[in-house]
């Protein structure tokens, strides 16, 4: 590798460390010509094939940005979003393929998001799964309730153990969840929020 300081074509590695998540390698290099030291980061590329057919490199920050929109107004910290983004990337990399469809990224987000916050899950799912009316919301809410019942019945002492499987950016403009003060046609969720479909 060329030295970024003197452009000498030869540098040597003096230290190598694997990142905590195991997905990248940090190397410390030294230039024998000018003596300068610098670091490089090596990582495998994970590609995402979009519905348009275009292929782009997976970006964990895009996952976090998309989920952050669904979590607006919810008691979710930035650290929670970072952990979810890491879970999504780990899940996709664990599949052992170099390229994944964008739909699979969405599915990988939904699983841990449901465990993190059910309201945010409904917001994200409404866009990812293209909800068209209140009936779609009702089906999603019923599915949430059924999954909660299964978890409780399967665990001793009434404590459900959630299996957080590792979970791209979607625009959150089609649907919103507002406080129970609105007068429009709506439906109240178990968490005390009114689900209202809106168009933009």
Swiss-Prot record:
Coiled coil: none annotated. Disulfide bonds: none annotated. One of its GO terms (biological process) is negative regulation of DNA-templated transcription. Its cofactor is Zn(2+). It comes from the Bacteria. InterPro entries: ATP-cone_dom, NrdR-like_N, RNR_NrdR-like. GO terms for molecular function: ATP binding; DNA binding; zinc ion binding. Residues 46-136 form the ATP-cone domain. Keywords: ATP-binding, DNA-binding, Metal-binding, Nucleotide-binding, Repressor, Transcription, Transcription regulation, Zinc, Zinc-finger. NCBIfam families: transcriptional regulator NrdR (TIGR00244). Belongs to the NrdR family. Negatively regulates transcription of bacterial ribonucleotide reductase nrd genes and operons by binding to NrdR-boxes. This is Transcriptional repressor NrdR. It comes from Bifidobacterium animalis subsp. lactis (strain AD011).
């Amino acid at each position: 590798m060329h030295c970024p300081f003197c452009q000498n074509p030869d540098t040597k590695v003096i230290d190598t460390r694997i990142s905590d998540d195991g997905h990248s390698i940090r190397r410390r290099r030294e230039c024998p010509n000018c003596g300068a030291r610098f670091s490089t980061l090596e990582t495998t590329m994970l590609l995402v094939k979009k519905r348009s057919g275009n292929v782009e490199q997976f970006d964990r920050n895009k996952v976090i940005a998309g989920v952050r929109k669904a979590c607006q107004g919810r008691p979710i910290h930035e650290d929670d979003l970072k952990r979810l983004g890491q879970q999504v990337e780990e899940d996709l990399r664990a599949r052992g393929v170099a390229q994944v469809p964008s739909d699979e990224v969405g599915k990988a987000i939904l699983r841990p998001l449901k465990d993190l916050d059910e309201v945010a899950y409904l917001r994200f799912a409404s866009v990812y799964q293209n909800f068209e009316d209140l009936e779609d919301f009702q089906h999603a809410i019923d599915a949430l309730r059924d999954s909660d019942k299964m978890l409780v019945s399967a665990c001793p002492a009434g404590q459900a153990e959630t299996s957080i499987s590792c979970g791209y950016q979607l625009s959150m403009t089609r649907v919103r969840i507002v406080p129970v003060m609105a007068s429009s046609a709506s439906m109240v969720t178990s968490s005390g929020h009114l689900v209202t479909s809106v168009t933009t």
